Design a protein with these regions (language model features):
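Non-catalytic helical/linker scaffolds that mediate oligomerization, partner binding
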Residues: 1-479
Length: 479
């Protein structure tokens, strides 16, 4: 049984070895995330090269996601590496402080003093520490500790309710986009976007560097939630980044927001990745908790394209076992996923021919109970349209474009297959598609398949033809 939901795994010290990475890919990793918060450009080049070498050896298409660091809204370093804050004590955040202590800490983000005032609530280390702002004087923010605990170097800072003015794309991010293009990353994730303008800028920078990576907006700010539809429209996909998002909007609000984000992304023909602490306990444990199993399964049932692992595979003790567990959970959850066609989605007025053909293929496959859908595609757009509805029939995306193969590795219920050469005629296409699907063990003689293609062929966005084929009939396309 194939798995529809894709798995994104973060590369880190625990998964830097080629043998471990190979086992992870064999276990089910579809996209490898490179965290650009760590490492130099040459490090990312080497990591991307290793991913591609291992994926080629395994024989699976594996995409690469470059995750930009974004603005560093964090405390600075401490003289002893960490301090303990007591409830009720006074604590100062000082933009001019070099090394912190138990009474004050420095700031990486020097403009924080402009964004807060008396009455503001600051959440440190993913909300584990809560500070109430009393007053702001010059470079110093005077606070009282509401909820204390251990605070160590470089922990993140959020303002309850949002409102931090740091730009989404820093100078480092702009340099990193050029590196992402250099390594031919399939996806670039933008951290902390506040508006559609942030995503349009990221796209412009990618194109200016000569790249074609899909942009993924990480929804982790209150402002991003408020501008959600515009941000989705300006992006190729979104990441439900539940860590910082939960800190800003409150953890109880996240489950409903997750469902809304995934639904809106699918309605707009965009990708959705669900991330953060999905299998967190497996950093130290060989098995997930029951709550984590339910969390992953619910994301699958919500319709997410992919579920993502962060520290679990980057720094955990059991990176391979974590991927294996996530694969099992996804496959089991998919057995319960409702196979139905959204009538509201199908009854909308279509504005594109390729969209119309794509959804007609899904409708036909669902009602005719065919074995497979074969979509000849240049860019992957046709396959993406098809993946927005769950008809219970797998979509095999046939493409002569290597970069389209690895991009489609993230599309739910889409299985990309590389065609070594572009068919010159529709009869060649029919023959090559049948042969490829047969050689892969997907269909046998007598099976029905739905085939979509463009006429003329080789044009991105040109899908305009649908044909129902019985494998082995050997009839010409026009028959």
């Amino acid at each position: 049984m194939s798995r529809d939901t894709k798995i994104v795994a973060t590369r880190g010290p625990a998964s830097s070895d080629a043998a471990v990475l190979e086992r992870m890919i064999r276990a089910g990793v579809d996209v490898v995330r490179l965290n650009f918060s760590h490492g130099k450009p040459e490090d990312h080049v080497a990591r991307a090269q290793l991913v591609r070498e291992v994926a080629t050896r395994v024989g699976r298409p594996v995409g690469i996601l470059a995750d930009l660091q974004g603005p560093k809204i964090r405390v600075g370093k401490f003289a002893d590496g960490k301090v303990w804050l007591e409830n009720g004590q006074h604590f100062v955040l000082d933009a001019k402080c070099e090394l912190g202590n138990a009474e004050r800490a420095g700031l990486d983000y020097k403009d924080l003093t402009r964004d807060v005032s008396a009455g503001s609530v600051l959440l440190l280390d993913d909300g584990r520490i809560v500070l109430d702002v009393e007053r702001v004087i010059g470079s110093e923010i005077y606070t009282v500790v509401r909820h204390g605990g251990e605070l160590s170097d470089n922990k993140g800072i959020n303002r309850q309710g949002g409102g931090l003015s740091a730009p989404a794309l820093t100078a480092k991010d702009m340099d990193d986009i050029r590196t992402a293009v250099r390594i031919e990353a399939d996806f670039v994730a933008v951290s902390f976007p506040k508006s559609a303008a942030d995503m349009y800028m990221a796209k412009q920078l990618i194109h200016a560097a000569g790249g074609h990576a899909h942009t993924i907006a990480k929804i982790e700010r209150v402002e991003a939630v408020e501008a959600l539809e515009e941000i989705i429209d300006a992006s190729d996909g979104i990441m439900v980044a539940r860590g910082d998002l939960a800190v800003e909007v409150g953890d109880a609000a996240v489950p409903a927001l997750q469902k809304r984000m995934i639904r809106l992304a699918r309605e707009r023909n965009k990708l959705a990745i669900t991330a953060t602490q999905m299998m967190e306990s497996m950093i130290l444990s060989p098995t997930p908790t029951r709550a984590e199993v339910s969390d992953v399964a619910n994301a699958v049932l919500d319709g997410t394209d992919a579920v993502m692992l962060s520290a679990e595979t980057a720094a955990g003790r059991y990176p391979v076992e974590t991927v294996e567990a996530m694969t099992r959970i996804c496959m089991e959850a998919e057995k319960s996923a409702e196979v139905s066609l959204d009538s509201e989605f199908l009854n909308q007025v279509f504005t594109r021919i390729d969209q119309t053909i794509s959804l007609a293929a899904i409708w036909t496959a669902h009602h005719l109970k065919v074995k497979a859908i074969a979509a000849l595609t240049e860019s992957g757009a046709t396959a993406l349209w098809m993946s927005r509805l769950n008809c219970g029939v797998p979509v095999y995306a046939l493409t002569p474009q290597p970069e389209a193969v690895t991009k489609m590795a993230l599309y739910r219920a889409v299985f990309p297959l590389f065609m070594t050469q572009r068919p010159a005629t529709r009869d060649e296409l029919l023959h090559d598609a049948e042969q490829l699907l047969t050689n892969e063990g997907i269909v046998v003689k007598g099976d029905l398949i739905v085939l979509s293609a463009g006429d003329p062929m080789g044009t991105s966005g040109g899908t305009n033809t649908l044909k129902i084929v019985r494998v082995g009939d050997q009839k010409p396309w026009s028959a």
